[in-house]
Amino acid sequence: ARLAAVAYRVRAHNNAVHASADAEEALGPEPSAEDAAKYYGGQVKSLRFRCRAAMLVCIPLIYISLGLPVFGVLKSSPTVAALVCLMMQLTVMLIGLDVITNGFFNLVRRTPGLESLVFLNCVFSALDAVVLAVTGSDAVGLPFCAVSAFSVACCLWSALNTCRGFKYTFRTLAVDKDPYTVSADSEVVKDSITVLKSKRDTAGFIHRSEEAGPADTIYAGLAPYLIAASVILGLLATILSGNYANILHVFAAVTAPCAPFAALVAFAVPFRTAARKLAQTGSAIAGWNGASDIGRSKHLIVTDKDLFTARNISIEDIRILDGAFPDKVISYTGSVIVASGSCLASVFTDLMQRNN
């Protein structure tokens, strides 16, 4: 956890310092909130079906892998058990084929991340299952197909929750035609973030919402080191044990914990829940970066209009002290209220009209 936190801070600092000037151009034109909501909403049905299918396949696979009671050839033949585990893993990999291809191409582009770690574990587990099926050996137990398959299923579940969160967020943005924005400003107070509410457009909100979450950011920095550590530890374990026939089983074991299930869904699930609850109040947050800015803010600007909205304020009466000129008092008071931008302006005007 400490290494992950350090990696996240270092990567965040590097991104802030070495941000590309043409980053906005690389993202392309920002879609409208309506189009973004339709796009992510359209992905939900497919992802929900694929996620459920993957989870259903994982249930018997986990049951077998835990060594729980089985019957028939599954109990008597290690070859059959290894082949069954392999077929179930390949089925889940086929259901989550985009996860596998993304992981592979990220490795080819030398930008490994969480999905690359899942891909590597799937490869080693599948090869290990093939070797165990061919040799018929039960000396090391069953392959780690359940871990690999469940990792792919968690990736699908994470994508499903992310799409749901974006659907709620962008639908709320599309409904409100004149929203108030709460933004994080780093120029109000030096070296710190200040949160303030204002009337401004929401340009850039969608692109900012779609930026990588904490797990992707952390593991983009950690993945190369985890891959290197897995190779070194796998080779050391094989050499020290002297059992070179089980090298694939060792590599499957050391790569299995590199992409923990919690990391795959650490942000997506709470983001979906928060986005749904915020949408019920007509609010939305710009993904992980919006939540991070609010969490790291140290100052908050609150105005009269935030505390005392116009619909909740009324003036009972005006009392002018003896010796004062009523016309001047009313004129000066009205000028001060209007100049201050206070929500008392409309209330004071209504009172003057009623008393005339």
Residue ranges and their predicted role:
Residues 2-7:
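Short amphipathic alpha-helices in soluble, non-transmembrane regions
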Residues 10-12, 282:
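Residue-level detector of short coil/turn "hinge" positions at structural boundaries
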Residues 12-220:
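Structural motif at membrane-water interfaces of alpha-helical integral membrane proteins
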Residues 14, 266-267, 312:
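Glycine-rich, histidine-containing beta strand-loop boundary motifs that form or position
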Residues 58, 81, 134, 344-348, ...:
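Signature of the cytosolic headpiece of P-type E1-E2 ATPases
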Residues 89-99, 148-174, 186-303, 329-344, ...:
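Hydrophobic alpha-helical transmembrane segments
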Residues 238, 308-328, 336-339, 356:
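Conserved beta-strand/loop elements of the cytosolic catalytic core of P-type E1-E2 ATPases, chiefly
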